[in-house]
């Protein structure tokens, strides 16, 4: 008899919970006809694309320095200058815009020096450029995982960003290709 009462109670409990689940489902609203303003979303996507274009050009420049290719580094510097100059800051707060103006102006100056210089001088400017791009990413964010890598030997220690956690040193290139370590992961 006790088992029968327990079975009936369990069935009653199941029936009540099933009824509640059906009622909750009826409460879900259909938003199919609702109009949404996607302009902000499109702006954010365009902004992400501009930030990612700057990063892509930066990585191309880094890879040219890793490969000891002065000419390709100069060409990459030219592309990076264009990406930096076309970067739209309008979707950021006033404070962020002011910071971005300073960062982008400085980064542009160093990228322009890279365009006109021999590889040793390109690497000197790449150090400051890397700091600028890292500062920019701290404001803009990124959709990809980045790795801040560090070489303790170049100019008393120098960092750069990479899309790979595998260390490829742009400051020494083939001389010390794997000198360095990942010091931070940026997501």
Predicted regions and their residues:
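Intrinsically disordered, low-complexity terminal tails/loops enriched in metal-binding residues
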Residues: 2-7, 17-187
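Hydrophobic core
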Residues: 12-16
């Amino acid at each position: 008899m006790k088992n029968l009462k327990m079975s009936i109670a369990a069935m009653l409990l199941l029936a009540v919970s099933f009824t509640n689940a059906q009622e909750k489902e009826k409460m879900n609203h259909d938003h199919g006809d609702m109009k949404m303003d996607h302009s902000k979303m499109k702006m954010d996507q365009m902004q992400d694309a501009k930030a990612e274009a700057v990063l892509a050009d930066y990585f191309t420049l880094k890879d040219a320095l890793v490969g000891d290719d002065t000419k390709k580094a100069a060409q990459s510097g030219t592309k990076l200058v264009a990406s930096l100059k076309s970067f739209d800051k309008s979707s950021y707060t006033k404070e962020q815009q002011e910071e971005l103006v300073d960062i982008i102006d400085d980064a542009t100056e160093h990228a322009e020096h890279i365009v006109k210089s021999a590889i040793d001088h390109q690497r000197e400017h790449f150090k400051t450029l890397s700091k600028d791009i890292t500062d920019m990413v701290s404001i803009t964010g990124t959709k990809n995982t980045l790795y801040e890598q560090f070489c303790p030997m170049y100019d008393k220690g120098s960092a750069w960003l990479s899309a790979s956690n595998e260390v490829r040193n742009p400051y020494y290139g083939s001389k010390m290709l794997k000198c360095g370590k990942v010091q931070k992961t940026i997501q």
